[in-house]
From Swiss-Prot:
Species annotation: Geobacillus kaustophilus (strain HTA426)
Gene (UniProt): rplU
InterPro entries: bL21-like, bL21-like_sf, Ribosomal_bL21, Ribosomal_bL21_CS
Protein name according to UniProt: Large ribosomal subunit protein bL21
Organism superkingdom: Bacteria
GO cellular component, one term: ribosome
Family per similarity comment: Belongs to the bacterial ribosomal protein bL21 family.
Entry keyword annotation includes Ribonucleoprotein: yes
Keyword hit for Cell inner membrane: no
PROSITE patterns on file: RIBOSOMAL_L21
Phylogenetic classification of the source organism: Bacteria, Bacillati, Bacillota, Bacilli, Bacillales
Subunit organization: Part of the 50S ribosomal subunit. Contacts protein L20.
Job of this protein: This protein binds to 23S rRNA in the presence of protein L20.
Molecular functions per Gene Ontology: rRNA binding; structural constituent of ribosome
Keyword entries, A-Z: Ribonucleoprotein, Ribosomal protein, RNA-binding, rRNA-binding
Amino acid sequence: MYAIIETGGKQLKVEEGQEIYIEKLDANEGDTVTFDKVLFVGGETVKIGNPTVEGATVTARVQKHGRQKKIIVFKYKAKKNYRRKQGHRQPYTKVVIEKINA
């Protein structure tokens, strides 16, 4: 059984036992989080949401928080001695999908 959930402005296909990296959640490590925005549930029977599947939830456990690899944003204008360098590391949360309730 699998489901498509929406979290952090992104849609993800998840299965039970899968580890996924999502946008940072306001939860502590070891906490259980529930995703209510389930757009699709697949398996033996298929349920398609309009826009979400009523009564369907996905339960996950927060494993850790972290920050992704640094990206560099560099702007310059040729021949004008104008340079701006900025770095960014996006925070993320690693969760393990425990149960899909449909």
